Structures are given as structure tokens and as C-alpha cells.
Amino acid sequence: MKRIILLAITVAAMGMTADALTGDVNGDGTVNISDVNSVINTILTDGTSVAADVNSDGTVNIGDVNMLIEIILSGGADDDITPKEIALDDSELDEPAEVIPDDEDDLDYGDYVENTVWSTTVHIAFDGETATVTGNPSTVNVAIDGAHVTITTTTKRVRYVVTGTTTNGSLKFYSEKKFQLQLDGVDITNPTGAAVNNQCGKSFYLVINEGTVNTLRDGDNYTMVEDEDQKAALFSEGQILVSGKGKLNIYSTGKNCIASDDYVFVRPGCHLYLNSTSGHGIKAKDYVHIKGGVINMEIAADGAKGINCDSLVYITGGRTTIITSGTTLIETDGEGNPTTTGCAGVKADDNMTMTGGTLNIKCSGNDAKGINVAQPLLFSGGELNVVCTGKQKSIAPKGVKCDTDCTIQGGTFYSCAPKGRALDVDGTLTIADGYTTLNDADPRLLEISF
């Protein structure tokens, strides 16, 4: 409580007057230190007050004191800030011609499906409760149970082309070699697990054929197999390398939309729509690289992220729009202690770098962060728009949160958190010279243009 009073003293000389402002606890038309004192008195006496519940989370606690101080220091309540509108956008994107690396010594050479000669083509056709596989040589073993297809092979350079519709089917691959999966107008729903499950740790080239619309759905309850992962409607033990000029819609009600135990690479041209009520949009262990394409995500699960990576996140092109609506996930650990996990548009446990493209993020749930980065954040190009409209319930909402250093040196950077802070950097914040716009007078809004 001493800390609360000390914080209150620091803002004692500051205040503002407005009609019907959030934070006017005592109803005198002014938001100032007396309102902070009113909230503190309510807490000390275990009282109740609708007006003292400044962040509207149903309780009167330290969160309301903190929000009042933020309001006074910033000179206004959230009522006086109108954030940018952020909405899903599946319109065509004019992207520059992609340069395919042709030098085998290039580190990215193997990420491009064009750099492999595919010698075998296998066709998989779904039809309701059944599936048919044709063109497979004897070295590509096929097991079919209804419309659940399992491929087991050691054959190199196999291309699988999949078509048709099933509401109770799946594709599973056991392979020792990299392979290509072409989606050529397919709709797969697996009520008991992943729609596509790749148990191969090698490169998994996912090609979305031009002019096609494809859909993958998982189910609420996964039937787990011992010693096997299936963490998403589209899961791979190896890298997921997405290309093509078609559309892929993924709906997840059981786990994540896309998950890789390696990395995820999305190339220009494709259109992805990811909708999850149970987990993340994209989950990866190694890194996530968005080089291009149009990606739209709607993530509703508590504690979930649009992009969640155990390591690095790179945004170098395309247009990615992430909308989250979940709030904080509260669980208990093995000792019965509560743990909290907040929502975020992008969560990187290592560095995040953005050099191009457009990244739009809107988080409407309480406690959410637009971008949450554990290691240095570098923004050197492209367009970033982050809006977090949620309130503080157990974790402070932030537009962009960086646990170490943050460097902004190019592009257009916009972050707005009407009930929190636009940018929170625990290390050193560096804004390079040469900007044409710098709007940082209010801690809830930050705009920088170069």
C-alpha cells in the first residue's frame, strides 16, 4: 500500500477536467489525485463502487489505481483516443516478382519447391466417407480407413495432389524424405484430430494451387497416438514451406491452425485465412518467416496468439492481419499455483525483425499485447499498425512490449493502447534520425514515419 500512496503523490499536482471522463470517481467533473484517493479508500475499507472500478473488470483493486495514474499522467481517459480501424482484408496484393535462389550454397535454396525435381506424382481424391489413391508406386504404401489416408514411404521426391471433400477424413504422412503436397481444391474435416498430419521431420512443401479454394478443419477432441504429436489442424514435425497462388482456409476448434516443430515459411502469392477458437494461428519452434502473401487471422481463444514462436519472427513482405478477442488464460501449475497467459497478436521468445510488408494487429480482449518480444525488436521497414483496446484485469495491456532493446529506423510505426501503453521497452529504445513524423506526447499512442 505504501507503493500505491507514493505513486499517487507523484501525480498529485496533475489533473484534468472533462465531461463524463473515465476515472472521475468522486463525480466532481475532474480526474485528479482525489479520485486516486477515493479508489485507495475503497480498497482499504473493502468497499464497493461502480465508479471506482475504473478498468471495468468487476473488482476494485490496484489495477484501477494504476489506470487512474496512467490517465492523469497522459492527460486524458481512453475516451479521447480514437484508434485506427483494423479489419480483415483478403483483397489482392500487388507483390514484386519473387526471386528464386538458384545457388545450392544459398541457405534458403532448399526452402523453394522449384529447386527440386519431383519424379513421382500420387493423386489422392476424397469423396465423402471414402478416399482413392492412384499413381503410387510399390514403394509408396497406402492405408485407407474410410476417408482417413495414411502414407508410408522412403521414396524421394514425391508430389501428392489432393482433391475432393470429406467431413470425416484426414491425411497422415510417414516419410524419411522431403515431399510436396499440392492442395488442388480440397476440403478435409477430421473430427478427432489433425486434418493433415506430417510425421516427417524433413521439408514439407505445401503448394496451394492457383485458382483453388481449400479448407482444413480439426475437431474438438483429438484422439492422441502414443509418441506422436498432432498440434494443429495442419501439423508437421518438419518445416512447413507454403507457396502457390490459391486460397487455404483453416478452422481449428481443438488445437492450433498451423503448427511446426521446426519453422514456418510463407511465400508471396498465397491467401491464408486462419480461424481458431482453441489455440494459436501459427505456432513454430524454430522461426516464422512471412515473406509475402495475404494472411488473415481471427483468434478467439483465451491466452492465444496469432503468431507464437519459441524463437525468431521475421516479417519481410506480404500483408498480415491478426485480430484476437480472447482474454487472459488462468491455469494452475503442478503445485496448485495460478499461472496467467495473456493474448497477443505476435509473441516471439527471441528476436523479432520487420523489414517490409504490412502487419496489422487488433487485440480487443483484456490484458492483451499486440506484439510481445522477449529479445531485441528491430523495425526497419514496412507498415506496422497495432491497436489494443482491452482493459487491465491481471496483466497490463500494451501495444508493443519488448523485454530488451527496441530499434525503430524505417517504415511506418503505429501503436495505440487506449487503456495501457503504446510501447513498453525494458531495455534501450532507439529511434533513428530522419523521421518525418513523431507523435509521442501521449504514452497510449505512438506514431513514427520515415
How should each PLM-predicted stretch be described?
Residues 24-27, 391-393:
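Short, solvent-exposed loop/edge segments of extracellular or virion-exposed proteins
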Residues 4-14:
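Sec-dependent N-terminal signal peptides
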Residues 25-48, 57-81:
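Alpha-helical segments with a strong preference for the paired helices of cellulosomal dockerin domains
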Residues 80-450:
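A composition-driven surface/loop motif
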Residues 17-22:
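Boundary at the C-terminal end of the N-terminal hydrophobic targeting segment
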